[in-house]
A protein has these predicted regions:
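Double-stranded beta-helix
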Residues: 118-184
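Short alpha-helix capping/helix-loop boundary micro-motifs
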Residues: 91-95
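Residue-level signature for short turns and capping positions that connect secondary-structure elements
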Residues: 35, 88-90, 114, 122, ...
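Short, conserved beta-strand element in jelly-roll/cupin
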Residues: 69-87, 108
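A short, N-terminal "cap"/entry segment at the start of jelly-roll beta-barrel domains
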Residues: 1-64, 179-180
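Conserved metal-binding segment of the jelly-roll/cupin
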Residues: 101-121, 130
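Short histidine-centered beta-strand/loop micro-motifs
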Residues: 62-67, 85-86, 96-100, 118-119
Length: 184
């Protein structure tokens, strides 16, 4: 990607709550960064060139969930959706952070951060990519209390910072921002 086209991602921080570990790392939302024409094929090629693997294509997933064993990236190639971050299934509605995404946007969700669609256009579609070598995601639904000694916290903390940012590569925000936080 041409350095002159760099766009700083939006950052959404969500702290641990009673039912979701969430993460010390912010969710990153890159606006209108996918190549045109924005379609499934071009989105897949673009995100996979930076050592992230495509593992599926989905529409809206309304069930609030998080992955304790891997980071996840959405490449939105069609439609739009309002997402919620940081709010688990047992949390009071409105406790999370909301963000609307649309075709051309990329979202990077750190391991442990609850996420779901709240509303979506009928044609909303995205690909899911994961750092190369990551295990198959496992979903938790934020329906039980997370205690200080919960094994989920150690599992999430053991997920490595990605080698590459899915949009900008080795020196991209997911690498630089998250490494700085982890080293702090």
């Amino acid at each position: 990607m041409d350095p002159s086209s760099f766009r700083e991602p939006e950052q959404y921080s969500v702290k641990r709550n009673a039912h979701c570990p969430n993460s010390q790392f912010p969710v990153l939302v890159y606006r209108n960064v996918l190549p045109t024409p924005v379609d499934e094929e071009s989105t897949s090629e673009f995100l996979q060139r930076n050592q992230w693997e495509k593992k599926g294509t989905w529409g809206a997933i309304m069930a609030k969930h998080f992955h304790p064993n891997t980071h996840e990236c959405y490449g939105i190639f069609q439609g739009s959706s309002e997402l919620v971050f940081g709010e688990g299934g047992a949390d009071e509605v409105g406790t999370g952070v909301r963000c609307t995404v649309s075709a051309g946007d990329v979202v990077v969700v750190p391991a442990g951060v609850a996420h779901a669609s709240v509303t979506s256009a009928d044609d909303y579609k995205y690909i899911g990519v994961y750092p190369e070598g990551s295990p198959k995601w496992r979903s938790e639904y934020g329906k039980r209390t997370v205690e200080d000694d919960d094994p989920l916290l150690n599992e999430i903390g053991a997920v490595p910072v990605p080698v590459c940012d899915p949009v900008y590569g080795h020196q991209g925000p997911a690498v630089k921002i998250w490494k700085a936080i982890r080293e702090f």
